[in-house]
Swiss-Prot record:
Keywords for this protein: Kelch repeat, Repeat
PANTHER family in the record: KELCH DOMAIN-CONTAINING PROTEIN 8A (PTHR46260:SF1), RING-TYPE DOMAIN-CONTAINING PROTEIN (PTHR46260)
Matches recorded under Pfam families: Kelch_1 (PF01344), Kelch_KLHDC2_KLHL20_DRC7 (PF24681)
UniProt-recorded name of the protein: Kelch domain-containing protein 8A
Organism, scientific name: Homo sapiens (Human)
Kelch repeat placement: 1-31, 32-79, 81-127, 128-175, 176-222, 224-278, 279-326
Length: 350
């Protein structure tokens, strides 16, 4: 596949969110984008639920979440949207699970989690939902792995994760669930573990080379990219924004040696990232400057280098993001105050 030139990328301003927010969860199903919950200007979790139509460039309000929440884990099972855990209006983790039927336009309560949790990582395969980790009411990270059986409306415990954590990144590849990074209390974890759905067992993979918070993970072809982030301050060490890029080769099963010339051009953390048309994209976030970053970059795997893209129209950090129809959407987030901006980085003709 031919990788597009940086000149082929452009930002489009889309219809803004109906209200400003941060920590909302996004989901694409049936070509539509759903925005679920989030926090308002006062940091209070919201019960808003809207759908965005790319064709009409329009947000439509849907029946509100029965339980207001932010940072909720979401997944689609056919024509149903499942929302799991998150933070409630009392600022505590939730055990509530709710399901929205797209055809009926109605919410239903489902079987609760065994323990309240926020920062759960969710993947779905064959109408089964897998929920890994999370942080409980006692603020301790969980090592739970549970699967939800939709036909029986039941959660079943599976083999626990070797490393307890919350806010990890997880993705499905074949019959394996890859779980990367995350946190224990305030501190970043560099564990990389894989659960085999068929054998129901965990395998520890080589740790992520650099431990950092607010980094991003992106998969492209047979590679997994670990990008940027914040090296946290401890004792005598100052916090430091990073431009590090680590690449894991999924065929070889190891981290590749990276030259400094392959690193990001800008140090950044808490940014938008994704893969578009054979390139890895990063945009916005926080860096060494006093204001939010507006810069965007694209990695060319053939040239092993980052190239400058057009700047974000509304610079932001802490955005929600999703890739839809060859566009990377940046939704809400923070620029001084909260933002309602929705912008898409698209490849020409998409």
């Amino acid at each position: 596949m031919e990788v597009p030139n940086v000149k082929d990328f452009q930002w489009k301003r889309l219809a803004p969110l109906p209200s400003r927010r941060v920590y909302c969860s996004l989901l694409e199903t049936g070509g539509q984008v759903y925005a679920i919950g989030g926090c308002d200007d006062n940091g209070v979790p919201m019960d808003c639920f809207e759908v965005y139509s790319p064709e009409a460039d329009q947000w439509t309000a849907l029946p509100r979440l029965p339980t207001a929440r932010a940072g909720v884990a979401v997944t689609a099972l056919g024509k149903r949207i499942m929302v799991i855990g998150g933070v409630g209006t009392n600022q505590l983790p939730l055990k509530v699970v709710e399901m929205y039927n797209i055809d009926e336009g109605k919410w239903k309560k489902r079987s609760m989690l065994r323990e309240a949790a926020m920062g759960i990582s969710v993947t779905a395969k064959d109408y089964r939902v897998y929920a890994a980790g999370g942080m409980g009411l006692d603020l301790r990270p969980h090592n739970h792995l549970q699967h939800y059986d939709m036909l029986k409306d039941m959660w079943v415990s599976l083999a626990p994760m070797p490393t307890p954590r919350y806010a990890a990144t997880s993705f499905l590849r074949g019959s394996k669930i890859y779980v990367l990074g995350g946190r224990q209390s305030k501190y970043a974890v560099n564990a990389f573990e894989v659960f085999d759905i068929e054998t129901r067992s965990w395998t520890k993979f080589p740790n992520i080379p650099y431990k950092r918070a607010f980094s991003s993970f992106v998969t492209l072809d047979n590679h997994l990219y670990s990008l940027g982030g914040l090296r946290q301050g401890r004792l005598y060490r100052q916090p430091k924004f990073l431009r590090t890029m680590d690449v894991f080769d999924m065929e070889q099963g190891g981290w590749l040696k990276m030259e400094r010339s392959f690193f990001l051009k800008k140090r950044r953390a808490d940014f938008v990232a994704g893969s578009l048309s054979g390139r890895v994209i990063v945009a916005g976030g926080l860096g060494n400057q006093p204001t939010v970053l507006e810069t965007a970059e694209a990695f060319h795997p053939g040239k092993n280098k980052w190239e400058i893209l057009p700047a974000m129209p509304t610079p932001r950090c802490a955005c929600s993001s999703i890739v839809v129809k060859n566009c990377l959407l940046a939704v809400g987030g923070v620029n001084q105050g909260l933002s309602d901006a929705v912008e898409a980085l698209c490849v020409s003709d998409s």
